[in-house]
Amino acid sequence: MFYGVDLTSRLMLGTAQYPSPQVLLEAIEASGAQVITVSLRREGAAGGAFRALLAKSRCRLLPNTAGCHTVREAVTTARMAREVFGTSWIKLEVIGHADTQQPDPFALVEAARVLCAEGFDVFPYTTEDLIVGEKLLEAGCKVLMPWGAPIGSGQGLRNLAGLRSMRAHFRDVPLVVDAGIGAPSQAAQAMELGFDAVLLNTAVAKAVDPVGMARAFGRAIQAGQEGFVAGLMPERDMASASTPVFGLAELA
Protein backbone atom coordinates (compact mmCIF):
# COMPACT_ATOMS: atom_id res chain seq x y z
CA MET A 1 0.00 0.00 0.00
CA PHE A 2 1.59 3.25 -1.15
CA TYR A 3 -0.23 6.40 -0.04
CA GLY A 4 -3.54 4.58 -0.08
CA VAL A 5 -2.93 2.87 -3.42
CA ASP A 6 -2.81 -0.94 -3.38
CA LEU A 7 -0.60 -2.37 -6.14
CA THR A 8 -0.56 -5.98 -7.30
CA SER A 9 2.86 -5.62 -8.97
CA ARG A 10 5.93 -5.11 -6.77
CA LEU A 11 8.03 -3.79 -9.67
CA MET A 12 8.38 -0.08 -10.40
CA LEU A 13 10.08 0.63 -13.71
CA GLY A 14 12.04 3.60 -15.00
CA THR A 15 11.50 4.91 -18.52
CA ALA A 16 14.90 6.29 -19.57
CA GLN A 17 17.59 5.00 -21.96
CA TYR A 18 15.48 2.50 -23.91
CA PRO A 19 16.43 1.80 -27.55
CA SER A 20 13.08 3.07 -28.83
CA PRO A 21 9.64 4.16 -27.60
CA GLN A 22 8.13 0.91 -28.85
CA VAL A 23 10.64 -1.18 -26.91
CA LEU A 24 9.83 0.87 -23.81
CA LEU A 25 6.12 0.15 -24.12
CA GLU A 26 6.71 -3.54 -24.73
CA ALA A 27 9.06 -3.73 -21.74
CA ILE A 28 6.50 -2.08 -19.45
CA GLU A 29 3.85 -4.55 -20.56
CA ALA A 30 6.16 -7.55 -20.19
CA SER A 31 7.25 -6.50 -16.70
CA GLY A 32 3.73 -6.25 -15.35
CA ALA A 33 4.68 -2.98 -13.64
CA GLN A 34 1.87 -0.68 -12.56
CA VAL A 35 4.08 2.28 -11.64
CA ILE A 36 6.59 3.92 -13.98
CA THR A 37 8.93 6.77 -13.18
CA VAL A 38 9.32 9.73 -15.47
CA SER A 39 11.61 12.73 -15.58
CA LEU A 40 10.17 16.20 -16.05
CA ARG A 41 13.26 17.13 -18.05
CA ARG A 42 12.57 14.43 -20.61
CA GLU A 43 8.94 15.48 -20.85
CA GLY A 44 10.01 19.03 -21.55
CA ALA A 45 12.49 17.96 -24.21
CA ALA A 46 9.89 15.81 -25.97
CA GLY A 47 7.27 18.54 -26.01
CA GLY A 48 4.46 16.42 -24.61
CA ALA A 49 4.95 13.47 -26.95
CA PHE A 50 6.59 11.42 -24.22
CA ARG A 51 3.65 11.89 -21.89
CA ALA A 52 1.28 10.79 -24.64
CA LEU A 53 3.42 7.71 -25.17
CA LEU A 54 3.34 6.78 -21.49
CA ALA A 55 -0.42 7.17 -21.38
CA LYS A 56 -0.62 4.09 -23.61
CA SER A 57 0.90 1.99 -20.83
CA ARG A 58 -2.01 2.79 -18.48
CA CYS A 59 0.45 2.82 -15.59
CA ARG A 60 0.49 5.20 -12.67
CA LEU A 61 3.15 7.86 -13.13
CA LEU A 62 5.78 8.61 -10.51
CA PRO A 63 7.57 11.81 -11.61
CA ASN A 64 11.06 12.32 -10.21
CA THR A 65 13.40 15.19 -9.44
CA ALA A 66 16.41 13.53 -11.06
CA GLY A 67 19.39 15.82 -11.50
CA CYS A 68 18.50 18.15 -8.63
CA HIS A 69 21.26 19.07 -6.16
CA THR A 70 19.57 21.64 -3.94
CA VAL A 71 16.34 21.96 -1.99
CA ARG A 72 15.22 24.79 -4.24
CA GLU A 73 15.80 22.80 -7.43
CA ALA A 74 14.00 19.74 -6.09
CA VAL A 75 10.99 21.65 -4.76
CA THR A 76 10.61 23.68 -7.95
CA THR A 77 10.87 20.56 -10.12
CA ALA A 78 8.32 18.74 -7.98
CA ARG A 79 5.85 21.60 -8.25
CA MET A 80 6.24 21.69 -12.02
CA ALA A 81 5.86 17.91 -12.25
CA ARG A 82 2.59 18.03 -10.33
CA GLU A 83 1.22 20.55 -12.81
CA VAL A 84 2.44 18.68 -15.89
CA PHE A 85 1.57 15.12 -14.88
CA GLY A 86 -1.43 15.80 -12.67
CA THR A 87 -0.28 13.71 -9.71
CA SER A 88 0.76 14.41 -6.14
CA TRP A 89 3.21 11.49 -6.24
CA ILE A 90 6.85 12.53 -6.48
CA LYS A 91 10.06 10.55 -6.29
CA LEU A 92 12.30 12.96 -4.45
CA GLU A 93 15.96 12.92 -5.43
CA VAL A 94 18.45 15.45 -4.08
CA ILE A 95 21.91 14.34 -5.14
CA GLY A 96 24.86 15.23 -2.95
CA HIS A 97 27.75 13.56 -4.76
CA ALA A 98 28.13 13.58 -8.53
CA ASP A 99 30.27 10.43 -8.84
CA THR A 100 28.23 8.13 -6.60
CA GLN A 101 24.85 9.84 -7.03
CA GLN A 102 24.48 9.47 -3.27
CA PRO A 103 21.60 11.53 -1.88
CA ASP A 104 22.29 14.59 0.26
CA PRO A 105 20.48 13.60 3.47
CA PHE A 106 20.23 17.13 4.86
CA ALA A 107 18.78 18.67 1.71
CA LEU A 108 16.60 15.60 1.17
CA VAL A 109 14.92 15.91 4.57
CA GLU A 110 14.38 19.65 4.15
CA ALA A 111 12.89 19.23 0.66
CA ALA A 112 10.67 16.42 1.92
CA ARG A 113 9.41 18.64 4.74
CA VAL A 114 8.47 21.39 2.29
CA LEU A 115 6.77 19.07 -0.20
CA CYS A 116 4.85 17.06 2.40
CA ALA A 117 3.51 20.33 3.82
CA GLU A 118 2.29 21.19 0.32
CA GLY A 119 0.35 17.95 -0.01
CA PHE A 120 2.79 15.88 -2.04
CA ASP A 121 3.04 12.12 -1.58
CA VAL A 122 6.81 11.87 -1.34
CA PHE A 123 8.88 8.81 -2.27
CA PRO A 124 12.35 9.82 -1.01
CA TYR A 125 15.45 8.28 -2.58
CA THR A 126 17.68 7.77 0.44
CA THR A 127 20.34 5.49 1.90
CA GLU A 128 19.89 2.71 4.44
CA ASP A 129 20.74 5.12 7.28
CA LEU A 130 18.14 4.67 10.04
CA ILE A 131 18.44 8.22 11.40
CA VAL A 132 17.80 9.73 7.98
CA GLY A 133 14.84 7.40 7.61
CA GLU A 134 13.42 8.59 10.93
CA LYS A 135 13.83 12.23 9.93
CA LEU A 136 12.08 11.62 6.61
CA LEU A 137 9.14 10.03 8.39
CA GLU A 138 9.01 12.96 10.80
CA ALA A 139 8.96 15.28 7.78
CA GLY A 140 5.79 13.55 6.57
CA CYS A 141 6.98 10.79 4.23
CA LYS A 142 5.07 7.51 4.42
CA VAL A 143 7.41 5.55 2.15
CA LEU A 144 11.19 5.13 2.17
CA MET A 145 13.32 4.20 -0.84
CA PRO A 146 16.83 3.14 0.20
CA TRP A 147 19.40 2.47 -2.48
CA GLY A 148 20.84 -0.97 -3.09
CA ALA A 149 23.97 0.51 -4.68
CA PRO A 150 24.84 3.65 -6.67
CA ILE A 151 22.42 4.45 -9.50
CA GLY A 152 23.20 2.54 -12.68
CA SER A 153 26.04 0.53 -11.11
CA GLY A 154 24.34 -2.88 -11.24
CA GLN A 155 26.15 -3.91 -8.06
CA GLY A 156 23.03 -5.18 -6.32
CA LEU A 157 22.57 -5.02 -2.56
CA ARG A 158 25.94 -3.81 -1.27
CA ASN A 159 24.90 -3.46 2.38
CA LEU A 160 22.74 -6.44 3.23
CA ALA A 161 23.11 -5.91 6.96
CA GLY A 162 22.00 -2.29 6.66
CA LEU A 163 18.97 -3.18 4.56
CA ARG A 164 17.99 -5.96 6.97
CA SER A 165 18.27 -3.51 9.83
CA MET A 166 16.13 -0.99 8.00
CA ARG A 167 13.42 -3.57 7.34
CA ALA A 168 13.45 -4.64 10.98
CA HIS A 169 13.39 -1.06 12.27
CA PHE A 170 10.63 0.24 10.01
CA ARG A 171 8.26 -2.71 10.25
CA ASP A 172 5.12 -0.86 9.20
CA VAL A 173 6.62 1.49 6.60
CA PRO A 174 6.54 0.58 2.90
CA LEU A 175 10.15 0.16 1.76
CA VAL A 176 11.30 0.14 -1.86
CA VAL A 177 14.83 -0.76 -2.92
CA ASP A 178 15.74 1.89 -5.46
CA ALA A 179 18.92 1.98 -7.57
CA GLY A 180 21.86 -0.33 -8.15
CA ILE A 181 19.92 -3.44 -9.15
CA GLY A 182 21.56 -5.18 -12.09
CA ALA A 183 20.13 -8.70 -12.23
CA PRO A 184 16.80 -10.41 -11.55
CA SER A 185 18.43 -12.45 -8.78
CA GLN A 186 19.34 -9.23 -6.96
CA ALA A 187 15.76 -8.00 -7.16
CA ALA A 188 14.52 -11.33 -5.82
CA GLN A 189 16.99 -11.03 -2.95
CA ALA A 190 15.55 -7.64 -2.01
CA MET A 191 12.07 -9.10 -1.89
CA GLU A 192 13.28 -12.07 0.16
CA LEU A 193 14.49 -9.55 2.76
CA GLY A 194 10.91 -8.38 3.12
CA PHE A 195 11.00 -5.20 1.06
CA ASP A 196 7.72 -4.13 -0.47
CA ALA A 197 8.89 -3.32 -3.99
CA VAL A 198 11.91 -2.73 -6.22
CA LEU A 199 12.45 0.23 -8.54
CA LEU A 200 14.90 -0.18 -11.41
CA ASN A 201 15.66 1.19 -14.85
CA THR A 202 19.11 0.65 -16.35
CA ALA A 203 19.15 -3.13 -15.87
CA VAL A 204 16.19 -3.41 -18.23
CA ALA A 205 16.83 -0.49 -20.57
CA LYS A 206 20.45 -1.49 -21.28
CA ALA A 207 19.87 -5.24 -21.54
CA VAL A 208 20.49 -6.98 -24.86
CA ASP A 209 16.78 -7.81 -24.87
CA PRO A 210 14.98 -5.20 -22.73
CA VAL A 211 11.58 -6.84 -23.14
CA GLY A 212 12.87 -10.25 -22.10
CA MET A 213 14.75 -8.73 -19.17
CA ALA A 214 11.66 -6.83 -18.04
CA ARG A 215 9.72 -10.08 -18.01
CA ALA A 216 12.51 -11.78 -16.05
CA PHE A 217 12.53 -9.04 -13.43
CA GLY A 218 8.76 -9.20 -13.04
CA ARG A 219 8.91 -12.94 -12.40
CA ALA A 220 11.94 -12.71 -10.10
CA ILE A 221 10.33 -10.06 -7.93
CA GLN A 222 7.15 -12.07 -7.67
CA ALA A 223 9.14 -15.19 -6.75
CA GLY A 224 11.14 -13.34 -4.11
CA GLN A 225 8.01 -11.87 -2.55
CA GLU A 226 6.24 -15.22 -2.49
CA GLY A 227 9.31 -16.81 -0.94
CA PHE A 228 9.35 -14.21 1.84
CA VAL A 229 5.66 -14.72 2.56
CA ALA A 230 6.10 -18.51 2.60
CA GLY A 231 8.92 -18.20 5.13
CA LEU A 232 12.57 -18.83 4.29
CA MET A 233 14.43 -21.52 6.20
CA PRO A 234 16.98 -20.17 8.70
CA GLU A 235 20.65 -20.27 7.72
CA ARG A 236 22.91 -22.69 9.61
CA ASP A 237 26.63 -22.69 10.28
CA MET A 238 26.78 -26.48 9.98
CA ALA A 239 25.21 -29.06 7.72
CA SER A 240 21.89 -30.62 8.68
CA ALA A 241 20.98 -33.75 6.72
CA SER A 242 17.51 -33.70 5.21
CA THR A 243 17.40 -37.49 4.82
CA PRO A 244 17.00 -39.54 8.05
CA VAL A 245 19.82 -41.91 8.93
CA PHE A 246 17.43 -44.57 10.27
CA GLY A 247 16.90 -47.54 8.02
CA LEU A 248 20.25 -47.40 6.26
CA ALA A 249 21.49 -50.67 4.84
CA GLU A 250 24.10 -52.46 6.93
CA LEU A 251 26.97 -53.52 4.73
CA ALA A 252 29.26 -56.33 5.80
UniProtKB/Swiss-Prot annotation:
Catalytic activity: [ThiS sulfur-carrier protein]-C-terminal-Gly-aminoethanethioate + 2-iminoacetate + 1-deoxy-D-xylulose 5-phosphate = [ThiS sulfur-carrier protein]-C-terminal Gly-Gly + 2-[(2R,5Z)-2-carboxy-4-methylthiazol-5(2H)-ylidene]ethyl phosphate + 2 H2O + H(+)
UniProt protein name: Thiazole synthase
Assembly, per entry: Homotetramer. Forms heterodimers with either ThiH or ThiS.
GO CC, any one term: cytoplasm
Pathway: Cofactor biosynthesis; thiamine diphosphate biosynthesis
Positions annotated to bind 1-deoxy-D-xylulose 5-phosphate: G152, A179, G180, N201, T202
Stretches assigned to coiled coil: none
Gene name tied to this protein: thiG
Gene Ontology molecular function: thiazole synthase activity
UniProt GO BP: thiamine diphosphate biosynthetic process
InterPro entries with a match to the protein in the record: Aldolase_TIM (IPR013785), Thiazole_synthase_ThiG (IPR033983), ThiG (IPR008867)
EC number(s) given by UniProt: 2.8.1.10
